[in-house]
């Protein structure tokens, strides 16, 4: 604790963000890291708690509290305050393989459980983390770590998202020969095609993939298991296989008019936009274009917000985002106490941009889409909705009830369905013969072994839709279990 009175004297700061209207003109990152001095000030606010709840990584009432990868947050906060940046980087990398990702797109459950947040704004942990790793790359402190010895064991990893990359990194450092298979044309999975460039610039992902390649990991893209290579071939060629395919099966909205032209899954929209941007700066026209259209995003989460931001950059005529839940309160309520994840109203980057563009927040709350209507050519022209009320039933459980008389018709030529994911796609599960429940691969947490010998599973493919930090956590842990399976014991943390 470098400055015992820091939390009393220094206010929380946000990193600089580009003007919303200016950033709508391009696809570059909307935010910037802290300056060195700002990071030191914010590090001084850390109280070095005896029990640092910021790093507990616990599940409280179904939500994540604290960091799931157990980042040594008070330690590197203090080192940053003291200007010992390289040591701060070393402490950060002990637990987090990819701080350049989490420092940008993680929802920061660490801050929600920060002890200071009981009475004051939390320490700016996420932005300090980003500044540490960015400074590490800028100063050349991060160089390829090529293993000095190889074990002679080979591991195949299916999927190159955060769980796959974390397990690959760990196993490679343990001396195993690792090959990562990715069905897309670029490695990175969700990091590459699931998150827009203005939120996570793809050069940052490519830099990490290049580093992992230099360290000895092989990436095989444009390769789908069951099409280009069979599961049996993988099991024959490798000593162990890890399934890290993510939860790619998108949840559908099966209502009247769903088959209208202009209704798309959110991830299809985001993926095509990013791919076209990377391939040709949109010159190939191989994307879903919202220009001049009334756009409605169904689903109130982060993926929906990314659709809003993408549509704004494409110069949509109007954008609305529908969510079934009521608007969150401005501060914690008595049934949402610290250190639970705070369920409070926030204004994310996409909503700031919509307010700047249209003068209003695009979110509509407690609303249910009842049907979609197409014109005589089958093209979507409008959505019908009704307001909902969230109430407790006689059993004490919440349920949603329609409010008669609140029906409304919305003009719409594009709709993006962003209501979550159901789990792993079935063809892959059948290829390997692994057991599953509700499209999630059956493999116990902490063990990660499926019912098929030598086949493991981790990340969203196992646990369902979750956070990037949980994917990294499971990638690291499954690597340890695979190392133990191959060698009898493990050198990995």
Swiss-Prot record:
Pathway(s) served: Amino-acid biosynthesis; L-glutamate biosynthesis via GLT pathway; L-glutamate from 2-oxoglutarate and L-glutamine (NADP(+) route): step 1/1; Energy metabolism; nitrogen metabolism
Binding-site residues, NADP(+): 299-313
Subunit structure: Aggregate of 4 catalytic active heterodimers, consisting of a large and a small subunit.
Protein name: Glutamate synthase [NADPH] small chain
Keywords: Amino-acid biosynthesis, Glutamate biosynthesis, NADP, Oxidoreductase
Annotated EC: 1.4.1.13
Induction or repression: The gltAB operon is positively regulated by GltC and negatively regulated by TnrA under nitrogen-limited conditions.
Gene3D superfamilies registered for this protein in UniProt: Alpha-helical ferredoxin, FAD/NAD(P)-binding domain
GO biological process, one term: L-glutamate biosynthetic process
InterPro entries: DPD_II, FAD/NAD-bd_sf, FAD/NAD-binding_dom, Glut_synth_ssu1, Glutamate_Synthase, Helical_ferredxn
Domain of life: Bacteria
Catalytic activity annotation: 2 L-glutamate + NADP(+) = L-glutamine + 2-oxoglutarate + NADPH + H(+)
Family as reported in the entry's similarity comment: Belongs to the glutamate synthase family.
A Pfam family recorded for this sequence: Pyr_redox_2
PANTHER family: GLUTAMATE SYNTHASE [NADPH] SMALL CHAIN
């Amino acid at each position: 604790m470098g400055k015992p009175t820091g939390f009393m004297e220094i206010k929380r700061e946000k990193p600089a963000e580009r003007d919303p209207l200016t950033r709508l003109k391009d696809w570059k990152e909307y935010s910037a890291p802290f300056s060195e001095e700002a990071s030191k000030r914010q590090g001084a606010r850390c109280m070095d708690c005896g029990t640092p709840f910021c790093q507990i990584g616990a599940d409280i009432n179904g939500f994540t509290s604290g960091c799931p990868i157990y980042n040594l947050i008070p330690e590197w906060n203090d080192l940053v305050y003291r200007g010992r940046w390289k040591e701060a980087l070393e402490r950060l990398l002990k637990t987090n393989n990819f701080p350049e990702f989490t420092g940008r797109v993680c929802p920061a459950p660490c801050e929600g459980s920060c002890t200071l947040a009981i009475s004051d704004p939390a320490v700016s942990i996420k932005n300090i983390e980003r500044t540490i790793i960015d400074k590490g790359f800028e100063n050349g402190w991060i160089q390829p770590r090529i293993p000095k010895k190889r074990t002679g064991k080979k591991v195949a990893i299916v999927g190159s998202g955060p769980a796959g990359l974390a397990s690959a990194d760990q196993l490679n450092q343990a001396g195993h020969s690792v090959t990562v298979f990715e069905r897309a044309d670029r490695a990175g999975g969700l990091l590459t095609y699931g998150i827009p460039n203005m939120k996570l610039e793809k050069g940052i992902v490519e830099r990490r993939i290049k580093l992992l390649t230099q360290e000895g990991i092989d990436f095989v893209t444009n390769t789908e298991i069951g099409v280009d290579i069979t599961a049996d071939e993988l099991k024959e060629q490798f000593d162990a296989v890890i399934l890290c395919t993510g939860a790619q099966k998108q949840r559908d909205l099966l209502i009247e008019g769903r088959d209208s032209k202009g209704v798309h899954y959110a991830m299809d929209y985001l993926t095509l936009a990013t791919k076209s941007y990377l391939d040709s700066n949109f010159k190939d026209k191989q994307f879903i274009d919202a220009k001049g259209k009334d756009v409605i995003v169904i689903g109130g989460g982060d993926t929906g917000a990314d659709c809003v931001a993408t549509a704004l950059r494409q110069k949509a005529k109007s954008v609305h985002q529908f969510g079934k839940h009521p608007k969150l309160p401005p501060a914690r309520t008595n049934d949402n106490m610290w250190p639970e994840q705070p369920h409070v109203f926030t204004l994310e980057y996409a909503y700031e941009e919509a307010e700047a563009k249209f003068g209003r927040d695009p979110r509509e709350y407690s609303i249910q889409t009842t049907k979609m209507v197409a014109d005589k050519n089958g093209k979507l022209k409008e959505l019908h909705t009704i307001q909902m009320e969230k109430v407790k039933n006689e059993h004490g459980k919440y349920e949603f009830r329609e409010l008669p008389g609140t029906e409304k018709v919305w003009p719409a030529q594009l709709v993006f369905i962003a209501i979550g994911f159901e789990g792993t796609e079935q063809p892959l599960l059948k290829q390997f013969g692994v057991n599953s429940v509700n499209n999630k691969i059956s493999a116990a947490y902490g063990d990660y072994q499926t019912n098929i010998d030598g086949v493991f599973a981790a990340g969203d493919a196992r646990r369902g839709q979750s956070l990037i930090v949980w994917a990294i956590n499971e990638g690291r842990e499954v690597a340890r279990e695979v190392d133990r399976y191959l060698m009898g014991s493990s050198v990995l943390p």
